[in-house]
Amino acid sequence: MKKIFILFFLTLFLSSCSSIKRVGEDDLLLKQNTIVVDEKKNTNSDLNELLVQKPNIKTLGLPLSLYFYNLGDKNKPNTVNEWGIKKPKTYNFIKNIFSEKQSISYANSMIGLNNWFLKNGQAPVIIKDEKITKTISNLTAYHKNNGYFRVKAQSSIEVQKNKKAIVNYTIDKGRPTFLDSIITNIKSSVLDSLYQSQKSLSFLKKGDQFKEANFIKEASRITNLYRNNGIYHFTENDLGYYNIDSAITNSYKTNVDL
C-alpha cells in the first residue's frame, strides 16, 4: 500500500512539473533578472536586494516550490459539500462501498492536501510592469543616495519561449558628487563648543563622496554627543540638516550646511 501511495504521489508530482502550468495566456513567468551597471555585469549584492520581483526559488536547480504549488489548485472545492458536488461519482462510490463518514473523511483529506500544496508551495512569479517600475525607482534612489545624482536606469523584457522572460536592468551611474565645504551655523555657543571639540570624528569630510548613510550617521553622532553632555532633550529633528546644494554644477561638488 505504501509503495502504491508513493507511486501515486510521484505521478502527481511529475505531472505538475511544468513551471508554466499556472501561468495565464497573456502572462510571462520571470525566469531571470539581470543588472548591468556602466556596461558591466553587476557584482553589488545590495542591488539584488532592491529587485521587487525575483524568480521562483530553486532547489538543486529546480523550482521545486513552484512544482508543489502547481499540484494544488485554487479553484478546487474548500468544503465537503462543494467537493461532493464537483466529485459526485467519487463521493458516492466511497459512500456506497464503505460509508458516508468515509466519503467525508476522504473529501477532507483531499481538501487538506490541496490547501497544503498551495500554502507550502510558491506561486509562479508573473512579471508585472508596476513592479519593474518600482525596481527602477529603487535602483535610482540607491545611486542618488550614494552621490550619483544624474543616474539613469532603464529596463527591458527579453521574451523567451514557453511563456518565460528575462528582465534586464541597465544603469548608467554618471559621475559621483563629492562634498566640498562643510559649513556650520550653530547659534548656541555651548553647542558649538561641544561640536568643535569632536569635529574630527565627523562622518562628513571635504572630498568624500556624497553618501546618504554618512549624513544619517552624523546626525546620530551629534545627537548622542549633546545628550551625553547634558542636553537630554536634543533630537535629530533639531538639526537644520541636509541643506545640500540642490543644483549640482559641472564640478560635481556640493556644499553642506549644518
Question: At which residue positions do the language-model features occur?
Answer:
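Interaction-mediating elements
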Residues: 18-258
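C-terminal motif of bacterial Sec signal peptides marking the signal peptidase cleavage site
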Residues: 13-16
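Sec-dependent N-terminal signal peptides
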Residues: 6-8
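Positively charged n-region of N-terminal signal peptides that target proteins for export
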Residues: 1-4
